[in-house]
């Protein structure tokens, strides 16, 4: 009996179907050749392994090659509790002055962090225009405000980075742990605008104010996450690269706040097709700059931070 051929991941099969459907509609609905090219390129990337495999494991069909430490791509999307804390300036807290806080978070965690969704663009009128444009890269503007974290590395390293990023980011989206916010909330401060935790309150606490060891839910906090990250790194043969696994082919959604990758130069603010006043970067959002971090492997160029 002949061996059954290995079945392609569902994600690849869906891509092939989308490609065939788009090809059929090309003459009927004027589907752009660029759309077909994008789908075709994604299929080739996954089948040939020319970049880290990015097959989403949404239905259990994806597997990690742990033995060979083949790179994987992890994506986590975290909602922001804007309904529970309408007066809390999450964007200002996460970005910091000139994007310095988000830049430091990325340097420390070796991940790609973006703020996406409704309310993620500085120019609200431009955001509304892009939301109604029907362009697929701005589809995220119809979703709730959220953070997207991407980690590309060997399996153990990728998960360790993701855990570290989630632990660090949680401190910035937990108003109860911000003494400035709690103090002002206790005095019944009204809604105001500013860069601090409370809209109109003092500025962000900065790195020195981000205390460690205040873990919640029984977890021992960032220190333990950092230890796990180091242990995962010591037990893998992976050679760290200055781009943290991202290459020049990386692209994503437009709008929001993100850091475009610029080859070996690291994460830099790139001029060009920005969306809205003061926006920079090829993906149409207000981009921050990616530079060297505290780890020996983080040797990217400094770039420049785009002001919020």
From Swiss-Prot:
Domain KH positions: 83-118
Regions crossing the membrane: none
Gene3D superfamilies referenced in this protein's UniProt entry, alphabetically: K Homology domain, type 1
MF terms in GO: mRNA binding
Keyword field contains Mitochondrion: no
GO terms under cellular component: nucleus; ribonucleoprotein complex
Modification after translation, per record: The arginines in the Gly-rich domain might be methylated.
Gly residues compositional bias, start-end: 203-220, 273-294
Keyword set, alphabetical order: Methylation, Ribonucleoprotein, RNA-binding
Alphabetical GO biological process terms: regulation of alternative mRNA splicing, via spliceosome
Disordered as annotated region, ranges: 203-222, 270-308
Domain of life, source organism: Eukaryota
Entry-linked InterPro entries: BBP-like (IPR045071), KH_1_KHDC4/BBP-like (IPR055256), KH_dom (IPR004087), KH_dom_type_1_sf (IPR036612)
SUPFAM superfamilies cross-referenced by the UniProt entry: Eukaryotic type KH-domain (KH-domain type I)
Keyword S-adenosyl-L-methionine: no
The name this protein goes by in its record: Glycine-rich protein GRP33
Organism lineage: Eukaryota, Metazoa, Ecdysozoa, Arthropoda, Crustacea
């Amino acid at each position: 009996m002949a061996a059954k051929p290995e079945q392609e991941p569902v994600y690849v099969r869906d891509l092939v179907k989308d490609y065939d459907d788009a090809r059929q509609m090309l003459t009927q609905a004027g589907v752009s050749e660029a759309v077909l090219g994008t789908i075709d390129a994604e299929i080739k990337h996954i089948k040939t392994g020319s970049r880290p495999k990015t097959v989403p494991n949404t239905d259990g069909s994806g597997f990690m090659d742990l033995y060979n430490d083949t790179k994987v791509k992890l994506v986590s999307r975290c909602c922001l509790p804007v309904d529970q804390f309408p007066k809390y300036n999450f964007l200002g807290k996460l970005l910091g002055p000139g994007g310095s806080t988000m830049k430091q978070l990325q340097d420390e965690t070796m991940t790609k962090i973006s703020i996406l969704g409704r309310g993620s663009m500085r120019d609200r009128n431009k955001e509304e225009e892009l939301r109604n444009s029907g362009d697929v890269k701005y589809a995220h503007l119809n979703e709730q405000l959220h953070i997207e974290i991407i980690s590309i590395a060997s399996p153990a390293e990728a998960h360790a980075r993701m855990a570290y990023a989630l632990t660090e980011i949680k401190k910035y989206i937990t108003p109860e742990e911000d003494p400035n916010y709690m103090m002002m909330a206790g005095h019944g401060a009204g809604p105001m605008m500013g860069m601090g935790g409370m809209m109109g309150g003092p500025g962000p606490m900065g790195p020195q104010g981000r205390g460690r060891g205040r873990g919640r839910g029984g977890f021992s906090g960032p220190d333990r996450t950092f230890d796990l990250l180091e242990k995962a790194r010591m037990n893998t043969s992976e050679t760290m690269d200055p781009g943290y696994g991202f290459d020049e082919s990386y692209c994503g959604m437009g709008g929001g706040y993100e850091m475009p990758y610029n080859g070996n130069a690291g994460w830099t603010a790139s001029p060009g097709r920005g969306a809205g006043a003061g926006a920079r970067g090829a993906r149409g959002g207000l981009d921050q700059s990616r530079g060297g971090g505290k780890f020996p492997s983080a040797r990217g160029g400094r770039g420049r931070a785009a002001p919020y």
